[in-house]
Swiss-Prot record:
This is UDP-N-acetylglucosamine--N-acetylmuramyl-(pentapeptide) pyrophosphoryl-undecaprenol N-acetylglucosamine transferase. The gene is murG. One of its GO terms (molecular function) is undecaprenyldiphospho-muramoylpentapeptide beta-N-acetylglucosaminyltransferase activity. HAMAP family: MurG. The lineage of its organism: Bacteria, Pseudomonadati, Thermodesulfobacteriota, Desulfovibrionia, Desulfovibrionales. UDP-N-acetyl-alpha-D-glucosamine binds at residues 11-13, 123, 164, 188, 250, 295. Belongs to the glycosyltransferase 28 family. MurG subfamily. One of its GO terms (biological process) is cell wall organization. It is found in: Cell inner membrane.
Amino acid sequence: MTRLIVTTGGTGGHIFPALAVAEAAMRLSPGLDVLFIGGAGPEGELAAKAGLPFVALPAKGVFGRGIKALAAPFWMLRAFGLAGARIREFSPDVVCGFGGYAGFIPVAAARLMGVPTAIHEQNSVPGVTNKVLGRFVDRVFTTYPDEGGVFPATRTKRLGNPIRADIARAASAAPHPGTKRLLVLGGSQGAKAINDAVMAILPTLLDAGVKVRLQAGRADFERVTTQAHAVLAGREAKGDEPEVVIENFIDDMAAAYAWADLVLARAGATTLAEVTAAGKPSLLIPFPFATHDHQTVNAAFLARAGAAQSVAQNHLPGLDLAGTVIGLLGDPARLEAMGQAALGQALPHAADDIARALLAMAAHKGER
């Protein structure tokens, strides 16, 4: 029986690609045995929901932690010992890390034990974990071209960022001519700066006939809903479709993308993988405090391809955001061109492609 370990932790941007690849590998190789190793973040709960056995290791970020980093050797030694024991017990044929500090030690331990190893990098600017691991793992899978030459070229392949299979079907949704539909996404947790910017221009958007669907995030949902109700008070409803829909979290993202004519969003790797696979034009506002400002680089990649416009968050106060949104929605030819450019950057089969590569590594385990 073939055995695969996937390892990562911390945020959904790392965890969901790992789960997507694990699920693809199990579908492509019935009987495959998969173990998820992570830290104390949400990965344990998410792995359980996916039906995967999970092992938690002590793991903490070191980069930028100052004096707290002095304790790193102690928990790292403990984590190495635990990881080594689990790897020896599970006896994997291949181990793949998906970034995040919780994904470092299992990959490093597996490499030292002679197990084939790989990593996947979601962002255009690699994190510290993958920068280090990329020097000695057998394979590196990336979402964006490795233009900076961070990883060894002979062992690196751009296969994309794994997403849910239903997202790509949004690209074939029937067009809705004459509509002006804006989908606003701030990531799974929402984004207060984006919520505030959209609420400030909501009356202008509605006056221009724009329909808005906004994922506010759980923490900001009540506040944004109250603001939206205040804007709608006294307005006469137009047509059968609601003018504004505020949600704390959108479960059916495929349907949301199929509905939208334009997406206003952050520039996280998963969001951009979904936007391109769905073939949607986008207006991107990168999160300015992301590690190494990788969202700005992510957004610039799509902007250069003609698939998106990118606006720095600190430029929002001086920007005619309403005019920008209304101008884009009022130019169907430009939206079509941006959508086609987005599709041109899409790699919608990333989960299957990475899974196949890992299964091939496992099949040739003894040939390393």
